[in-house]
């Protein structure tokens, strides 16, 4: 199964996305480092099935095909927030980086409102 890590600064919505994609109920709060340990859950990536797209015989081994749609199982990993200097051990530091390195791919969740400063604290929008 493909492992995808969710990375980004603290308080950017990683756990909200994780809960929506996996139907989990991990804690969500408006303070830095609500997520202290990685959470894992299963989800599915959905794409057009190869038999429909290329008009060929389909024999999926790592997924399933239903009504022309391919459902590919993935493991999502909700990682603790990243702050400046994590590689030096700041915040949850190396604990975060070790799990991120074990992922097959990373999704960088970004808070476009600019309401989170470099330490992960909520600030006025546009100042973070």
Where are these regions (language model features)?
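Conserved G1/Walker A P-loop phosphate-binding module
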Residues: 1-127
């Amino acid at each position: 199964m493909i492992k995808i890590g969710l990375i980004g600064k603290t308080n950017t919505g990683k756990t909200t996305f994780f809960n929506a994609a996996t139907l989990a109920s991990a804690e969500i709060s408006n303070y830095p480092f609500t997520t202290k340990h990685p959470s894992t859950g299963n989800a599915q990536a959905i794409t057009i099935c190869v038999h429909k797209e290329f008009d060929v015989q389909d024999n999926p081994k790592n997924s399933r095909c239903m009504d022309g749609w391919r459902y590919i199982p993935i493991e999502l990993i909700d990682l603790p927030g990243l702050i400046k200097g994590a590689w030096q051990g700041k915040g949850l530091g190396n604990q975060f980086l070790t799990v991120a390195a074990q992922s097959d791919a990373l999704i960088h969740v970004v808070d476009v409102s600019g309401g989170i400063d470099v330490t992960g604290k909520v600030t006025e929008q546009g100042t973070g």
